């Protein structure tokens, strides 16, 4: 967090060197460990233990009913000609922007098998789990329901019969439902989102095959470029256990925060795709450090009321001055 990048073990070593100076005052009686030492540590360190320890230290409180978004991201730099790039599946709390758990797979297709195991390791009781269409699987919905949570999951071509039935219904009768419409203006565009939720699914032949299924939804996203007037429009479909339209819309909207608030920042701020760490637990442990750092930076900006401050600028300030770094690491320290 006290430097521009956090791509590999050498960057962690440089951070340690910086923190050994100034008011942070870390003591290394035998000298600062070299990058190979950090590499060996991260290769054997249990990622879940590291994650639980760091998030527990931060002490973030979750809302009683949170949106827990599941999504995967491929660390492109971790692959080579002999070994595919690692794919990290994350459970991300949209409201507090903390990570509940991660799992690494060697291929994106393995995400389907990894998600149920990941859900069994975390507490999601009372929460709303959201996911993209890859996770639209009967086993995953059953796991979510068994864990005491609700869900809103995207529906696409990997469930062709179900998708066809839902599209056909909305095409024929969608106008009979009262929609919820939202409008957002920013980044040079106007974005309208229209949400529909249908809970009378007695017509749906597959309804008994999906645990907890209580409704199907549709979201239409219409984007207008303010400068050119160019418009784009796209429809997305969902299966859900929710019965409230506002809650459904809020859950879908917050799921996109995984891309906007997490994955994009990991790539742009910490250049995660440039990381070459690929052995044993190193990729996931470095991924944990990046996510915790992002959360610390975000929470500091929010608490200080500095909405216009960029994370890059704050990281630069931490690198220049150890007092700034301490303020981010320990915001309640007087």
Locations of the language-model features?
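Alpha-helix initiation and N-capping motif
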Residues: 6, 35, 47, 51, ...
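An anionic, glycine-rich sequence signature occurring as long contiguous blocks
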Residues: 150-253
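Short coil/turn segments at secondary-structure boundaries
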Residues: 8-11, 53-56, 179-183, 262-268, ...
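Conserved, well-structured functional cores that handle cations and Mg-NTP chemistry
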Residues: 1-131, 136-139, 305
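A C-terminal functional module that forms or caps the active site or interfaces directly
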Residues: 215-297
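A short, flexible helix-boundary coil/loop motif
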Residues: 16, 265-334
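Structural signal for hydrophobic packing residues in well-ordered secondary-structure cores
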Residues: 13-17, 46, 58, 62, ...
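Nuclease catalytic cores that cleave nucleic-acid phosphodiester bonds
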Residues: 100-188
């Amino acid at each position: 967090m006290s430097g521009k990048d956090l791509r590999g073990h050498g960057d962690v070593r440089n951070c340690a060197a910086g923190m050994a100076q100034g008011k942070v005052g870390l003591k290394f009686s035998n000298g600062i460990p070299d990058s190979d030492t950090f590499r060996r540590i991260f290769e054997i360190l249990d990622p879940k233990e590291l994650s639980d320890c760091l998030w527990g230290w931060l002490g973030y409180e979750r809302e009683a009913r949170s949106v827990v978004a599941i999504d995967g991201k491929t660390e492109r730099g971790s692959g080579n000609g002999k070994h595919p790039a690692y794919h990290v599946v994350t459970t991300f709390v949209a409201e507090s922007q903390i990570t509940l758990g991660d799992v690494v797979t060697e291929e994106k297709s393995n995400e389907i098998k990894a998600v149920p195991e990941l859900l069994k390791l975390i507490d999601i009781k009372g929460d709303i789990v959201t996911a993209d269409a890859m996770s639209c699987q009967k086993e995953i919905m059953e796991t979510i329901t068994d864990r005491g949570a609700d869900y809103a999951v995207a529906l696409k071509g990997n469930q062709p019969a179900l998708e066809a039935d839902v599209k056909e219904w909305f095409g024929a009768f969608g106008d009979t439902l009262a929609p919820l419409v939202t409008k957002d203006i920013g980044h040079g565009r106007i974005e309208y989102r229209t949400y529909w939720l249908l809970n009378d699914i007695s017509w749906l032949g597959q309804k008994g095959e999906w645990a907890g299924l209580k409704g199907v939804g549709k979201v239409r996203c219409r984007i207008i470029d303010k400068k050119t007037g160019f418009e784009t429009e796209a429809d997305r479909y969902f299966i859900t256990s929710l019965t409230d339209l506002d809650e459904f819309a809020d859950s879908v909207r917050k799921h996109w925060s995984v891309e906007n608030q997490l994955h994009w920042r990991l790539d742009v701020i910490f250049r995660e795709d440039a990381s070459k760490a690929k052995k044993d637990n190193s990729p996931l442990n470095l991924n944990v450090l990046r996510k915790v750092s992002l959360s610390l930076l975000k929470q500091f900006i929010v608490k200080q009321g500095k909405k216009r401050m960029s994370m890059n600028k704050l990281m630069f300030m931490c690198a220049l001055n150890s007092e700034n770094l301490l303020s981010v690491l320990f915001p309640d320290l007087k």
